[in-house]
Amino acid sequence: MSNEKNENDVEFESVGVVELPEARVIGLYGDVNEENSQEAIVSLLHLHYNRGSEVTDDGTVISLPIEFYVSTGGGMVAEMFAMYDLMRMVRKDCAIQTFGIGKVMSAGVLLLAAGTKGERRIGKNCRIMLHRVLTGDSGSLHSFQATYNEAEIVEEMMFRALADE
């Protein structure tokens, strides 16, 4: 992971989660794992509780949206659901515009779908891939059966969540 600066002297990491608070932008790049999900959750909460607003021509005050860019090969299910649940809560108060870039695979698909309806986009060359839940369990038959049962539950949760979006 390397830190870089752009011409506006904004520091960002080349892998992981990037937050540009003034622009209300979050980027999730790389695996959906504990570190990246924690950073994304903190960024979402920060932008949610420090939400900007603007006044329209008719005097209506509206919350500024959060832009959430996703490029991931997937990752951990628990962390995906943590981000997904938070995104659903946040979007009740302000729109979340999701943008799929590069590749959006596995756990990233649900995060892309968690954006506000009508505010989800993918790049022209973005690849989307969804697959059944994978397990890497080995050991006793009892252990394998428990893992298989859990995988079925998680898979059903994910497909139900996607259908709800």
Residue map of PLM features:
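Terminal-region recognition feature
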Residues: M1-E165
